[in-house]
Amino acid sequence: MVEAVVDSGAVHSVAPPGVFPGRVRPSLWSRAGRGYRAANGTSIKNLGEVDVPFATAEGHRCRIPFQIASVEQPLLSVSHLTSAGNMVQLRDTDGTIVNTTTGRSIALERRGGVYIMKMWVPDAAAPLPFGRQGA
């Protein structure tokens, strides 16, 4: 299980290298040499992106592209979520992400002043649920 911090100031959803399984592929920003700026002003290089399939505590199967960079923990961009058709609601003790088309919702936990989304990420080494026909 991976915990991502919901970040209303993040342009992209970003994670440190090695947190998510899968091949890091070049992204628009990594190819253009663009990166990020940390809160203390230091520059952070964009290393590419990983498409992350995951399940939520509610059993929803989701997929989000994460940019890979030397950040401390996975950050989930509110801007990216809302651009993808979701509404993010943050309350005093918790929050939710609601898909405006399907109505599906994902619970967020508020801990230490930040909102956390729990992601159950499949192991890259796990066998696929269906074998290829003729294999």
Q: Residues of each region from the PLM?
A:
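Generic recognition of well-structured, leucine-rich alpha-helical segments
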Residues: G22, S27, A39, T82-V88
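Aspartic protease core domain of the pepsin/retropepsin superfamily
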Residues: D51-A135
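Basic, gly/Ser/Thr/Pro-rich low-complexity segments located predominantly at protein N termini
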Residues: V14-A15, N46, P53, T82
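Sterically constrained small-residue positions within well-ordered secondary structures
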Residues: V6, S27, S43-K45, A57, ...
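Aspartyl protease active-site motif detector
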Residues: M1-Y36, P65-S70, L76-S77
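Pepsin-like aspartyl protease folds
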Residues: M1-E3, H12, S30-E49, P74, ...
